A protein has these predicted regions:
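Short flexible coil/turn linkers enriched for glycine and charged/polar residues
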Residues: 25-28, 82
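Short helix/loop segment immediately N-terminal to the Walker
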Residues: 5-13, 129
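Short, non-transmembrane amphipathic alpha-helical segments
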Residues: 1, 38-58
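Extended interfacial segments that mediate partner engagement and assembly in macromolecular machines
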Residues: 1-8, 21, 26, 41
Length: 197
């Protein structure tokens, strides 16, 4: 209808690389993020008009990605409409999920898996837990309900922003999050811990 071409990885031409659709299984919120080979989406208003007719539509964004590789998402995103994120729950923990952050594709099964992990971890309330590659803090915040302290490490800054916001949303104050490579952050904080004890 708008004659917008899809991206061709071989030639590097075309605009629409991917369409990421996220759905909050418990909240019924929907996010659409179009990954584009450029900076803008022509005739975006027409697309927005159509998408907001869908029940539950909460966020419409674009993520520019002009790299000549097969990495899906760009390094940033622009909000075209809505709040720029959706929310969902795993158990009784609420999560804010932005376009660039990893979120489990099947939160219904994830809730069961995390419940088992929490049961098997048999946390008594005096443990310190490190969640390496923590994403938006799904496991971290789930375990923080039973642990004394939880630390999450993730290389994606937007995911850590979401993790910190998720801790705030849930009034969880025994979780801290760090941006960086796990293999660098963990030894640094372990050395600091050793000096203090």
């Amino acid at each position: 209808e708008n004659k917008i071409k899809s991206y061709d990885e071989k030639t590097g031409k075309g605009l629409i690389r991917h369409a990421l659709i996220r759905y909050g299984f418990k909240t019924k919120e929907i996010m659409v993020c179009l990954v584009v080979n450029g900076k803008k989406l022509p005739k975006a208003e027409r697309l927005i008009e159509k998408l907001i007719q869908i029940e539950g539509m909460t966020s419409i964004t674009i993520s520019p990605n002009t790299r000549r590789d097969n990495v899906i998402m760009g390094d940033s995103y622009e909000i075209l409409w809505g709040q720029g994120y959706i929310t969902d729950y795993i158990g009784n923990v609420k999560y804010q999920i932005s376009p660039l952050s990893f979120y489990q594709v099947n939160p219904v099964q994830t809730e069961k898996l995390y419940g088992l992990a929490l049961e098997y971890a048999d946390l008594k309330g005096d443990e310190t837990v490190w969640d390496l590659y923590c994403g938006i803090g799904t496991i971290s915040l789930f375990l923080a309900q039973k642990a004394k302290q939880v630390y999450g490490v993730e290389i994606v800054p937007q995911a850590i922003d979401d993790a910190k916001e998720n801790a705030k949303i849930n009034a969880i104050d025994n979780a801290e999050f760090f941006v960086g490579k796990a293999e660098e952050v963990l030894p640094e904080y372990y050395a600091e811990y050793e000096r203090e004890h």
